[in-house]
Amino acid sequence: MVTIRADEISNIIRERIEQYNREVTIVNTGTVLQVGDGIARIYGLDEVMAGELVEFEEGTIGIALNLESNNVGVVLMGDGLMIQEGSSVKATGKIAQIPVSEAYLGRVINALANPIDGRGKIAASESRLIESPAPGIISRRSVYEPLQTGLIAIDSMIPIGRGQRELIIGDRQTGKTAVATDTILNQQGQNVICVYVAIGQKASSVAQVVTSLQERGAMEYTIVVAETADSPATLQYLAPYTGAALAEYFMYREQHTLIIYDDLSKQAQAYRQMSLLLRRPPGREAYPGDVFYLHSRLLERAAKLSSQLGEGSMTALPIVETQAGDVSAYIPTNVISITDGQIFLSADLFNSGIRPAINVGISVSRVGSAAQIKAMKQVAGKLKLELAQFAELEAFAQFSSDLDKATQNQLARGQRLRELLKQSQSAPLTVEEQIMTIYTGTNGYLDGLEIGQVRKFLVQLRTYLKTNKPQFQEIISSTKTLTPEAESLLKEGIQEQLERFLLQEKV
């Protein structure tokens, strides 16, 4: 017979009590009052932070944007079709952040940094806040290194430096994306990480850009962040910040980055949609009052870091679409005032066959000239002046038929210079090639050719100089200056090729 000993039982009970550990987790919860149009109104969530992520019962994530006295306005990061009135919502205690790593290079992702190219997960051990504060004044230094776009018109007259913010602005179908993608292609071998953010674009357009970059081997150093036109407004609004967070990751690791936002008009429209649905008061053009801050806090993250922080840089090329060339609309004027210059693309120039359709007269770069190499400065000054005089003369020449010889010569020179600025898409030129092209035009070597022969001659000249005068390129790339020796080599090469070309044309 088993004897029951009271002390044993009391010991067992004591052990069990000591081992018992009741974990209490406090969850900040609320209830869905209303849901629809990508917006949910929540009752409860008393201690939620502005911008905090909240999780719905069925798994959808949202961001708390409006904190009102009796409810919280949440924007949804998904379609939210399964969310029901009365279902519960819990605050996560986190602000929106994304994983970051080198493994993102060559991938296409969405605004939440999830891959959408069907190539599996992306390994990442670190994460960054989507909304990070911009570097302060002490953390920056002035722009001094060039970021070459490969387009003669930009690199000579509207130069861009590493760490600059240069707006690309123009009507639809004027080649804004082409200028941006050509700039990405030209970074090959330059040790620059590129991030292309597509906001509210057609999926077919994004696929076209990705294919173009893949074919030319540019995806190796590029990340594409895409939220197409059918994405929820919340994700279209977040996409540029996600792109900026990825670019910042590389910038703070002492690397140079280039980020393209294509385009910020669509981001502003997505933000307007969210704000109006949240019943925030509308302002000019029905945009909310803080739409300027929407873009300024994004573009201020582009910087050239100081030497203490490793001299990394983030160059931003935001794109803004205008309606019928109206740059005095709300979003264009806002972004023009935030950026360090703008490149205007004109529909009239585009339709008249001048591509890239850059209106050099009203495009400016406010800090880039400090970043130009000396050799480019030596040849570009004359080009700017001659084109400005040509534009003025051309306007007068329309009204007068009898022009003196000097004016006729100046008009002929101007037409050839304009021809020299034309470039095919996806055919960026090196700085050395640009310098030889501009030098040929501004020193009158093209004056004897027909306008139709100019481009053909320049293509042959570049090939001829590359094979027969390689020292020219070596001098420019090593000294960054057009030395007397380089100039004499260039003159010889142009003269020799010009004679050969004229003989060919006669035959």
From Swiss-Prot:
Site (Required for activity): 363
Entry EC no(s): 7.1.2.2
Binding residue positions for ATP: 170-177
Bilayer-spanning residue ranges: none
Top-rank EC class of the record's enzyme: translocase
Membrane topology recorded in Swiss-Prot or TrEMBL: Peripheral membrane protein
Pfam families with a match to the protein in the record: ATP-synt_ab, ATP-synt_ab_C, ATP-synt_ab_N
An example molecular function term from Gene Ontology annotations: ADP binding
Cellular localisation: Plastid, Chloroplast thylakoid membrane
List of residues that carry Phosphothreonine: 257
Catalytic activity: ATP + H2O + 4 H(+)(in) = ADP + phosphate + 5 H(+)(out)
Similarity comment text for this entry: Belongs to the ATPase alpha/beta chains family.
PANTHER family reported in the protein's UniProt record: ATP SYNTHASE SUBUNIT ALPHA, MITOCHONDRIAL (PTHR48082:SF2)
Quaternary structure, from the entry: F-type ATPases have 2 components, CF(1) - the catalytic core - and CF(0) - the membrane proton channel. CF(1) has five subunits: alpha(3), beta(3), gamma(1), delta(1), epsilon(1). CF(0) has four main subunits: a, b, b' and c.
Name of protein: ATP synthase subunit alpha, chloroplastic
Organism: Lepidium virginicum (Virginia pepperweed)
Lineage: Eukaryota, Viridiplantae, Streptophyta, Embryophyta, Tracheophyta
Gene name per UniProt: atpA
